[in-house]
Amino acid sequence: MGFFSTILGFCGFGVGISLGLVIGYVLFVYLLPNDVKDPEIRSIADQDPKAMLRMLPEIPLWVKNPDFDRVDWINRFLEYMWPYLDKAICKTAKNIAKPIIEEQIPKYKIDSVEFETLTLGSLPPTFQGMKVYLTDEKELIMEPCLKWAANPNILVAIKAFGLKATVQVVDLQVFAQPRITLKPLVPSFPCFANIYVSLMEKPHVDFGLKLGGADLMSIPGLYRFVQEQIKDQVANMYLWPKTLVVPILDPAKAFRRPVGIVHVKVVRAVGLRKKDLMGGADPFVKIKLSEDKIPSKKTTVKHKNLNPEWNEEFKFSVRDPQTQVLEFSVYDWEQVGNPEKMGMNVLALKEMVPDEHKAFTLELRKTLDGGEDGQPPDKYRGKLEVELLYKPFTEEEMPKGFEETQAVQKAPEGTPAAGGMLVVIVHSAEDVEGKHHTNPYVRIYFKGEERKTKHVKKNRDPRWNEEFTFMLEEPPVREKLHVEVLSTSSRIGLLHPKETLGYVDIPVVDVVNNKRMNQKFHLIDSKNGKIQIELEWRTAS
């Protein structure tokens, strides 16, 4: 009897402990305390110092930190738009999650995973402040302080082995301070190509998780474990300097950089038509690359010759070989007046094979459609023989990012042996002012070539964002780029039609060594004037 009583005692003890744990868990989860009171609301002026210290972490950043701006207008916008944003975000989340779930569930022998209910609730996130950084690069950097105490209802049904279980997420709280970078800024809507998101500190994430109606987060120890795991996992993926990159625009279309160089050799023309009374002509060829701001390039004039030979070579930077075309126009030079067009034709770059010489014989026409005003093609105008070579840039020379490379004054070690292309981007100027007028434009001199930007009328802080290229046979390790800001009067008859607003000479050796430089230069002969110039050096081999 003593043995059986001992066994029964142990069984009773086990049953009692089990029932006690179950009853205690149910009471802990489902019974609400009765001593809950609404918080007392008082003005800040009535708070004592200890209460103020307790409330200090909850004060918005725009109050504590002068670098942060108040953005109540964004909060009002979110409050008004949240019912519509909620539906749109949930619909997008379902569409993104569906193929991922379908791919993963066979690995775990799960029949299905479905969203029975998905809503983010009626409370939108709020921004406690926002800090904006200004840089010389084509980017916009923002650091908002985000707080979101939401009442979502996310109910997921999981079916496996003939059983169904529901998991519900409620009472979500997220406090985070992300850094959002929009770059590069481009002239195509929405005006930026990528979104870079980083977290400046570990986020605070809190939520309720129910399984079959029971709150799993109420289990002692589980809440803290889950919260720390979420913080660590999110920090490992997105804590600065790690970033989440969201592409918005196709890089090739958003930021059209030169991708190669086309070498053009004008060999000869055959059978040109007579243009003067003596039965001859003074032909020359004008070459233009479509969608390029660089002026047309010209051959020399061959006097009194209907079958001229030039054998002259030219180079053009290519941005889109699939759409750009070379336009060849033959003109008859006139000593007085404008030259007369003798014929023209075009050649699409997409017909070129990279790194392969190819000869073309182009039949000259009056216009691209062969005639004018709907008339049939005119008489024979001769032929033009040209040779082309398209050399795309190597992968090493293509731009990999938009981070600034600082220029360093040092000897040109490792200078490339072959020639290349110098890209000059004139961004903007600041505090330029003339004595008689301020209609600024920029004139660039480099190795005997000249480039000009457009004129900006009556502006002390003009923006151009214009790009120019210089084809060079060898690296410019000893040359300087002369940049001059000028102003011309918009009126006729003034005593001072043109004046200099400042200039700067930029050594190009640093660009050859470092591939890229983007900075502001103080203008000489200007009181406070500055100009922002971006330089790049690219080789074709």
Curated annotation (Swiss-Prot):
SMART domains per the UniProt record, alphabetical: C2
Domain SMP-LTD: 67-249
Cytoplasmic side: 33-541
Phenotype of the disrupted gene, per the record: Reduced growth.
Localization, UniProt: Cell membrane; Endosome membrane
Occurrences of domain C2 (ranges): 240-362, 401-521
Residue stretches spanning the membrane: 12-32
One Gene Ontology CC term in the entry: plasma membrane
Keywords from the UniProt entry: Calcium, Cell membrane, Endocytosis, Endosome, Host-virus interaction, Lipid transport, Lipid-binding, Membrane, Metal-binding, Repeat, Transmembrane, Transmembrane helix, Transport
GO biological process, one term: endocytosis
Positions in the Extracellular compartment: 1-11
Cited InterPro entries: C2_dom, C2_domain_sf, SMP_LBD, Synaptotagmin_plant, Synaptotagmin_SMP
Tissue specificity annotation: Expressed in roots, shoots, rosette and cauline leaves, inflorescences, and siliques. In roots, expressed in vascular bundle, epidermis, the differential zone of the tips of root hairs, and the quiescent center and columella of root tips.
Stored Pfam families: C2 (PF00168), SMP_LBD (PF17047)
Stretches for region Phospholipid binding: 227-509
Chain positions recorded as Ca(2+) binding sites: 276, 282, 332, 334
Described function: Plays an important role in maintaining plasma membrane integrity during freezing and osmotic stresses. May function in membrane resealing during calcium-dependent freezing tolerance. May regulate endocytosis and endosome recycling at the plasma membrane and cell-to-cell trafficking of cabbage leaf curl virus (CaLCuV) and tobacco mosaic virus (TMV) movement proteins via plasmodesmata.
Misc: Phospholipid binding to the first C2 domain is calcium-dependent, but binding to the second C2 domain is calcium-independent.
Description of how the protein assembles with itself and partners: Interacts with cabbage leaf curl virus (CaLCuV) BC1 protein and tobacco mosaic virus (TMV) MP protein. Interacts with ROSY1.
Protein name according to UniProt: Synaptotagmin-1
Organism of provenance: Arabidopsis thaliana
Gene coding for it: SYT1
